[in-house]
């Protein structure tokens, strides 16, 4: 992993939802850099937004640690999703993909049932799917975008957790929040609000599901180099993305995936109700 590549990301832009192959520089998802140690041996994981970026890195590292994986993705992301499935299967683990849009309760119930059918059960749920678009001021945020952002980012994890509550007894739920929940950017007004809501949801769920030994935690990434960035931000904002962190660079997806592996593993058996920041030094308090 060449971290120096991410100290000066050049200006670039993609059509939404973005493609991994078009990113410059190419991000590290752990394809070669991650060495598994059997920390998730035999576990079965459902990862939403698993086609690219953080979700792809979580899928790859989980597979390298011994887990079977189902990823959920939008139909528009089928090409990236298939690449991720092949990377999972290359580790000798079961990998499947389900195309869906998780903006309504029915779609989440159907995904839950399909994932259980494909893997025979679910031990780890990773709620990672997210939507964002940037605008310079509140008047520029279209109503339909705000609704979509909340439906995808907040309602989806709520409904999916509800559908898998019984399956996840003695299991683990990990929700992707963001440094934006703690230090919001005006250009991400709706997105930042959803991530703050997810922090609250994670803590609340940890309290409610603790008696059935379901651990619930959240990971709050900082600026991570994924297709979402050039697909939702202007070229000007992409130029030098992440260089404002104390570490002076954006993060690779695999650097965030390490937090998910820890929280899904037995090493985190007494960790629940927490938000773990992977932010390059940006504060999350």
Task: Describe the predicted segments one by one.
Residues 6-10, 23, 31-32, 135, ...:
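Short C-terminal tail/terminal secondary-structure segment
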Residues 161, 194:
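Active-site helix of classical SDR
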Residues 158, 167, 249-278, 283-284:
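C-terminal substrate-recognition "lid" of short-chain dehydrogenase/reductases
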Residues 141, 184-192, 204:
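Active-site loop-to-helix junction immediately N-terminal to the catalytic Tyr of the SDR YXXXK motif
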Residues 178:
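Residue(s) in the substrate-gating loop at a strand-loop-helix junction
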Residues 166, 207-211, 269:
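Alpha-helical segment proximal to the catalytic Tyr-Lys
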Residues 136-138, 142-147, 241:
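Substrate-binding pocket helix/loop in short-chain dehydrogenase/reductase
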